Amino acid sequence: MGRPPLPLISVEALTSAALELVDQTGDFSFPKLAKRIGVSQSSIYNHVSGRDEILELLRHRIITEEPYSPVDHQDWEAALRVLIRAYRDAFARHPRLAPLMVLQSITDPDVIGLYEDLALALEAAGFRGRDIVSAISTIDSFALGAALDLAAPEVVWDPPADGYPALKRALSFSGPPSERGDHAFDFGLDVIIAGLRAKLAS
């Protein structure tokens, strides 16, 4: 009687298993990954070089699972709105992945393509060089923060009974918790676009 067949393993299966672990626990490890797929740890290295490659595969997966519409770079404000929303929505579907993504360089061509679209839109607006890099860094921070905000508890600020009157007045008008994140994102997106417009005019 022959040996039982080894479980099939692929890069796609590894990526899916790693994403499931991150969604559930906030991280992944090779022992947990091997156990989930039902293979030995050593067999994983036949398909990926290590943790960094898996992280880039995860980045590729979440950015490409719902592709954004092509943008007209010349209409830079509309283009930025599409791109920033797509970036935020990608991480909003997997908010626990966001902290892991800031730990290494971005190399995936499809993800780099999103940043190329950002750079082209900013260039069309009139920005150059260092200002484009600074604008992209600002957008990056905002989009990742907005995605993490969607994973926040329903009650983010719970001030003590005494004091803090200004915050309490603001919170009384903040609306249902489920709407807070979306409203904050739309507000922040308007602020970023207005700020970029003002920067160009200065």
Stretches found by the model and what they are:
Residues 1-32, 48-56:
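Basic, helix-initiating cap at the start of DNA-binding domains
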Residues 12-20, 36, 53-71, 78, ...:
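Alpha-helical structural segments
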Residues 15, 19-23, 63, 88, ...:
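Regular secondary-structure segments
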Residues 33-36, 44:
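Append "Primarily bacterial transcriptional regulators
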Residues 47-48, 135:
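Residues in the recognition helix of alpha-helical DNA-binding motifs
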Residues 67-110, 139:
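Hydrophobic alpha-helical connector segments
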Residues 114-161, 196-199:
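Hydrophobic alpha-helical bundle segments that form small-molecule/ligand-binding pockets
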Residues 155-202:
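C-terminal peripheral helix-coil segments that are non-catalytic and often amphipathic
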